């Protein structure tokens, strides 16, 4: 008896399941209203011709959508309709599809619209010549160019587009162009979320504006607040400054960028190249800092001046540029090298300062970090060393050493050394070579 009950219950459930499937697959298109009904089996076999009157359009409904048009051909056996003239398809209270022509299959729930197609949702408008709308998948698709308008200022053009209604996401492919009054984005593929304005691009992409040009092959841009994050072959051009890095964060409103890993910053105005592994660039303030194996190379006539340290801070415009190198700073030049805890170079007065670390630290550690310079056969040390460069030629003009000045010089025979010490030291250069020295107070040799 128990087996019979189970079999009966299973059979009933199976019958109900098949009934549900059958009902779902055969939901019929409903004709809600029309001005005129007619049949013409000679011209339109098996079709009912529905036409509007002076007051109202033809109204049709099917499983959650309502349709209006001037005229419709209804194929009841096929559960299929063709609509003509000022067609409107409305799904819920958020999706409106306008066109001049519409085909709709009640069994597959697939619609095809053509002629001045306009798809409207709360955050965007899609314009195209023809569009497929799959209600089962809740996807709309075009393949013959379309334009999406967002908030009356952003437009996105592409040859192919796919809109996922549930995710509020567009997928654009081939010749994609996003236009904004401030910038343009050209890319082969772009995913765009209408609700939050986030754009994700794939492949060679350019973002152009008056203030900057950006290139990457994988990235993201927030069209609502004008910030972006770019990876893979990332490059940002700020007029005369080019930033290359593995990844770059960008804020258009602040004219700010931060970069990470394998950074190279080219400054064509000041003729220098800066490298490191993390940097922040404040273009409006003409400033930046770079850290993690930071190095800056500045062109000086036929030579280059290199400054290397843990962190480098650069501020000021071309005439007032200041370079500050912190912690384990080193300087290299064809005829000069040196190191200190910190190096401070001011282009406006041509002074480069080699600064000792805090004197309150352990004496042995302090002495090991004392500034030191090498120039041809000379080695110079002191608590603080100041080099003065000629501003026009960038040649070294003079030298000042404050406190515990010491100079070691190889003698003219090359067999020994001369050494001089004192409280302070002054030196003069000729063709970048130290030629004369004056010791101030407590001179010893």
Q: What is the predicted role of each segment?
A:
Residues 1-27:
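Bacterial Sec-dependent N-terminal signal peptides
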Residues 22-445:
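N-terminal amphipathic/hydrophobic interface segments
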